[in-house]
């Protein structure tokens, strides 16, 4: 995947092999973002993926509308409101970003190298976004930065431009090994960052590479040993190479970027990140950490990764609405048994739109994807259990489509810039307001962007609206006339009964839905004991709730009792 990487004789000695550390928590949690390759078939798929990626990335820059400045904007706001202060427990001291900037919002006034400026012009960028204007100058000056910005704000360019300039000024060559590492929570976001970096480095001689779970590890190791100057990585695969790939030179590391730090920690990579930071050299390393939210865990990660006195940059005033201005948001209240019928009716009426539907689990995505395609409502599906080849192809197919429906888990909720999305449908409710904000952030991206979102809630889940209100998220209530909802319940039930594979898939989806529901953090809102399992089962095409084995701790017994009681009714 790295373009222009050439094998050279290295004068440096090989770094000492680090002792392999076992992940004691690895067997306890499932990670959708980094499954390992085990079969020959998948190995072949990934070799094919490697050869195809460069072709796919030719269009990536066009997909990243969040990084494109508004060329029609005639007047730039000169001041933002006072940035939010981090808690007393955070790194001390934090230096607040100066409200005044260089006085110009143009890239050409940053004093960048000729190859970088040529690439920026080739990509069609002229003016900086707020986060770029406030972040790039201090990073070019060598400061460590902790940044907070809304999704779609253009932070990818904000950290890549200084990183590439550093490699250029130090005249990095393949034999010097890796000088910059960018850590990303998901494969798709890593691929997207790789695409932007590839375009930015088009006129540079430095080398670029990517290591992600699900890709061919041997090919990755070969490229690392030849010398990758700027490396994009997901946490698990990066730690694997740091510990086990002999000939991977990282002793000359000059910059570490941690993107979407809160998401990295949320999906269970806290231990890996601590090990990565411990392994990497820190003496002359500049670090950049970006996070949409400043949690205690993010502050802990900042403490061990950033040097003393980092610059804190927040371009989101505390009183500002948390979602994009051009986003029209609403919710609909319906009982569990009507949820799928309403979704089907909505999708059928908006078949010419570009829509993303979020569900709570891989098996739910798999089932509803199979069901909708079976009943002639074409959809794409994206989830963490798919092979990397499938995930990548689906991602680019939906990005390039003018209309279509993508059913997915939260693997697509953070950071991905998918152009011209008309609707975001949250069929299964988000875990908290942060997840809601990142889901709806897939539409109305960039300055002047427009989009709509719709969230499905049952009557017992309406308490979630209080949390959204507290997070400055404005919602309208939508109503759908019952006579406009397609009544296909009897046909659905007959189909599930008569089709063995759909029946099994429906059963797996039903089980996964209950497990996901029981794992919600907001227990006062999402109370599994209040679910009407007969109605929930109907939404999956069952007359009565199927008997399923679910491991959800203390709630398991009460659910099984409820199953038995409601099957008798």
UniProtKB/Swiss-Prot annotation:
The keyword Hydrolase applies. It catalyses: ATP + H2O = ADP + phosphate + H(+). PROSITE patterns: DEAD_ATP_HELICASE, HELICASE_ATP_BIND_1, HELICASE_CTER, Q_MOTIF. Keywords: ATP-binding, Helicase, Hydrolase, Nucleotide-binding, Nucleus, Ribosome biogenesis, RNA-binding, rRNA processing. It is found in: Nucleus, Nucleolus. Residues 1-57, 71-110 are annotated as: Disordered. The keyword NAD does not apply. Its main location: nucleus. SUPFAM superfamilies: P-loop containing nucleoside triphosphate hydrolases (SSF52540). A motif (DEAD box) lies at residues 259-262. InterPro entries: DDX18/Has1_DEADc, DEAD/DEAH_box_helicase_dom, Helicase_ATP-bd, Helicase_C-like, P-loop_NTPase, RNA-helicase_DEAD-box_CS, RNA_helicase_DEAD_Q_motif, SPB4-like_CTE. One of its GO terms (biological process) is snoRNA release from pre-rRNA. One of its GO terms (cellular component) is small-subunit processome. Residues 326-496 form the Helicase C-terminal domain. Residues 71-85 have a biased composition (Basic and acidic residues). This is ATP-dependent RNA helicase HAS1. It comes from Meyerozyma guilliermondii (strain ATCC 6260 / CBS 566 / DSM 6381 / JCM 1539 / NBRC 10279 / NRRL Y-324) (Yeast). The lineage of its organism: Eukaryota, Fungi, Dikarya, Ascomycota, Saccharomycotina.
């Amino acid at each position: 995947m790295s373009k222009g990487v050439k094998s050279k004789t290295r004068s440096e000695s090989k770094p000492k092999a680090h002792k392999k550390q076992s992940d004691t928590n690895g067997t306890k949690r499932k990670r959708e973002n980094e499954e390992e390759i085990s079969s020959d078939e998948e190995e072949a798929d990934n070799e094919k993926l490697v050869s195809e990626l460069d072709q796919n990335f030719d269009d990536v820059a066009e997909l990243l509308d969040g990084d494109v400045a508004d060329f029609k904007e005639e007047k730039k706001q000169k001041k933002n409101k006072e940035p939010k202060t981090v808690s007393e427990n955070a790194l001390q001291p934090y230096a607040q970003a100066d409200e005044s900037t260089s006085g110009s919002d143009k890239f050409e006034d940053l004093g960048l190298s000729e190859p970088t400026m040529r690439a920026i012009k080739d990509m069609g960028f002229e003016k900086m976004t707020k986060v770029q204007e406030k972040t790039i100058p201090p990073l070019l000056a060598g400061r460590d930065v902790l940044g907070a910005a809304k999704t779609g704000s253009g932070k990818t360019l904000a950290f890549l431009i200084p990183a590439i300039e550093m490699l250029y000024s130090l005249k990095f060559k393949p034999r010097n090994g890796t000088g910059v590492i960018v850590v990303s929570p998901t494969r798709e976001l890593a691929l997207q960052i790789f695409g932007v970096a590839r375009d930015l480095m088009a006129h540079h001689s430095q080398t670029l590479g990517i290591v992600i779970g699900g890709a061919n590890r041997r090919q990755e190791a070969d490229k690392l040993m030849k010398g990758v100057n700027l490396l994009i990585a997901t946490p698990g695969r990066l730690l694997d190479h740091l510990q086990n790939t002999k000939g991977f030179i990282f002793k000359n590391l000059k910059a570490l970027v941690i993107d979407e730090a809160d998401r990295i920690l949320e999906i269970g990579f806290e231990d890996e990140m601590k090990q990565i930071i411990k392994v990497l050299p820190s003496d002359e390393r500049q670090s950049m950490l970006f996070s949409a939210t400043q949690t205690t865990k993010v502050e802990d990660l900042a403490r061990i990764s950033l040097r003393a006195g980092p610059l804190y940059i927040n371009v989101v005033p505390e009183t500002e609405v948390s979602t994009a201005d051009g986003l029209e948001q609403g919710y609909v209240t319906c009982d569990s048994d009507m949820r799928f019928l309403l979704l089907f009716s909505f999708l059928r009426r908006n078949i010419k739109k570009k829509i993303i539907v979020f569900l709570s689990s891989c098996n739910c995505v798999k089932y509803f994807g199979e069901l909708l395609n079976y009943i002639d409502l074409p959809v794409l599906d994206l989830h963490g259990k798919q092979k990397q080849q499938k995930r990548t192809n689906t991602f680019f197919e939906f990005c390039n489509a003018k209309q279509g429906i993508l059913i997915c888990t939260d693997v697509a909720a953070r950071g991905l810039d998918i152009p011209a999305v008309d609707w975001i449908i949250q069929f299964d409710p988000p875990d908290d307001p942060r997840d809601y904000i990142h889901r709806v952030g897939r539409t109305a991206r960039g300055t002047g962007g427009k989009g709509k979102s719709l969230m499905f809630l049952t009557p017992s889940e309406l308490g979630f609206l209080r949390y959204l209100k507290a997070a400055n998220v404005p919602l309208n209530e939508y109503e759908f006339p019952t006579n406009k909802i397609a009544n296909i319940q009897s046909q659905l039930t007959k189909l599930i009964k008569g089709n063995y594979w759909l029946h099994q898939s429906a059963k797996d989806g039903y089980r996964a839905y209950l497990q996901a529901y029981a794992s919600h953090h907001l227990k006062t809102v999402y109370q599994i004991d209040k679910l009407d399992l007969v109605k929930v089962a109907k939404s999956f095409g069952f007359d009565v709730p199927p008997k399923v084995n679910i491991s959800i701790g203390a709630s398991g017994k009460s659910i099984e009792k409820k199953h038995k009681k409601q099957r008798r009714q």
